């Protein structure tokens, strides 16, 4: 299964939604999976899921856009993809 342009658009659209809307959906899903968790634990799990998936998804979209710009001759800063939390454009790996 390969990624297509609509996958990137859906990723950006999903993570552009207001945070309360994202949390409501995730908390509803997590609420069904773990009835013993407190509200705080479910919020923490939701935040972790958003951070991990959002960082990776947006990082890939940004990298693809930069790659496309280089191919068109509107070259931006060249950064290889790397995992990390926070701003995906500033993610680096050490080692």
Swiss-Prot record:
A Pfam family matched in the record: DUF717
Highest taxon of source: Viruses
Region (Disordered): 66-95
Family: Belongs to the herpesviridae UL91 family.
Name of the protein in question: Uncharacterized gene 30 protein
Organism: Equine herpesvirus 2 (strain 86/87)
Lineage of the species this protein comes from: Viruses, Duplodnaviria, Heunggongvirae, Peploviricota, Herviviricetes
């Amino acid at each position: 299964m390969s990624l297509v342009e609509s996958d990137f658009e859906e990723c950006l659209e999903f993570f552009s939604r207001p945070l309360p809307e994202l949390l409501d959906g995730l908390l509803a899903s997590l609420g069904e999976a773990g009835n013993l968790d407190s509200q705080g634990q479910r919020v923490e799990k939701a935040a972790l899921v958003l951070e991990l998936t959002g960082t990776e998804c947006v990082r890939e979209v940004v990298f693809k856009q930069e790659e496309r710009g280089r191919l068109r001759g509107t070259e931006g800063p060249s950064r290889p993809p790397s995992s990390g939390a926070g701003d995906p454009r500033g993610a680096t790996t050490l080692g």
